[in-house]
């Protein structure tokens, strides 16, 4: 009888931490609610500043003039990279070709800012478990990206949702390394960012790859690291080769 009583006491002791953990996770989910209103307001403000002010006051930088000229020139004749100089990605020039730097371009920039804020918040919240700090990081992000886009860095801005989406999957792995899910999607997202801003995306890929390498070496997950590399390469190639073939055709 005393043995059974001891088992019941141990069972209760084991349940208490579990119930406390569930309660804490529930509280965390409530405190880490997505600051959607903040993201929408900041995205609208940044879009107005970075696109409306340069056009209305004729303050467009040399990079902005060059990018929009490339989009206009594609309507005339020739091909990008061969007949016209271009340092940005193919999808970026395709967007400027379709939108011609007008209202539709502003819509795409606004959507990119909303998606970038969402994925950045989710990444920071996953790594820190602090919704308030993640929200503050989102505010800093919008302040920094205002200066970036105001100087003509539209391509990098449009690549950020893809890069942050990839980083959110990496953050999920770092917080729970018991699974290797999502690495093909990481490759797909990185390829999307590459075809908007190649140089910025390559720098981002190098930093994330170094971080994953250090993490896997520190946790002795050598086989997992090799598998992750193959999965990312597969996802990247699924976007890279068809798009590169189109640009060369």
Show which residues each predicted segment covers.
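Start-transfer (signal-anchor) and selected internal transmembrane alpha helices
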Residues: 1-51, 232-233
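Perimembrane helix-loop-helix junctions
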Residues: 203-235
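Transmembrane-helix signature of polytopic, membrane-embedded enzymes
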Residues: 111, 117-147, 160-161
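Membrane-interface alpha helices of multi-pass inner-membrane proteins
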Residues: 182-198, 204-205, 209
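Short acidic/glycine- and proline-prone juxtamembrane loop motifs at membrane-interface regions
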Residues: 149-159
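Extracytoplasmic catalytic/substrate-binding loops of multi-pass membrane glycan-assembly enzymes
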Residues: 55-70, 80-95
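Loop-to-helix entry region of an early transmembrane alpha helix in multi-pass inner-membrane enzymes
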Residues: 86, 90, 94, 100-118
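Membrane-interface transmembrane helices that cradle and orient dolichyl/undecaprenyl
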Residues: 125-130, 164-185, 218-219
């Amino acid at each position: 009888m005393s043995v059974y009583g001891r088992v019941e006491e141990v069972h209760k002791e084991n349940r208490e931490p579990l119930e406390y953990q569930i309660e804490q996770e529930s509280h965390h989910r409530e405190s880490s609610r997505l600051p959607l209103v903040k993201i929408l307001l900041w995205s609208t403000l940044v879009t107005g500043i970075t696109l409306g002010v340069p056009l209305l006051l004729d303050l467009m930088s040399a990079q902005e003039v060059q990018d929009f000229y490339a989009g206009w020139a594609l309507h005339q004749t020739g091909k990008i990279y061969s007949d016209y100089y271009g340092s940005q990605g193919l999808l970026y020039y395709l967007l400027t070709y379709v939108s011609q730097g007008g209202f539709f371009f502003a819509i795409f920039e606004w959507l990119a800012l909303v998606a970038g804020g969402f994925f950045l918040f989710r990444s920071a919240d996953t790594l820190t478990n602090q919704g308030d700090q993640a929200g503050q990081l989102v505010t800093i992000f919008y302040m920094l990206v205002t200066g970036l886009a105001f100087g003509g860095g539209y391509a990098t801005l449009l690549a950020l949702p893809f890069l942050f989406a990839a980083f959110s999957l990496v953050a999920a792995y770092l917080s729970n390394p018991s699974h290797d899910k999502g690495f093909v999607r990481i490759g797909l997202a990185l390829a999307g960012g590459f075809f908007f801003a190649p140089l910025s995306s390559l720098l981002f890929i190098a930093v994330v790859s170094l971080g994953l390498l250090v993490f896997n070496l520190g946790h002795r997950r050598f086989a997992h690291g090799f598998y992750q590399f193959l999965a990312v390469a597969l996802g990247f190639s699924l976007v890279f080769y068809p798009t590169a073939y189109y640009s060369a055709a």
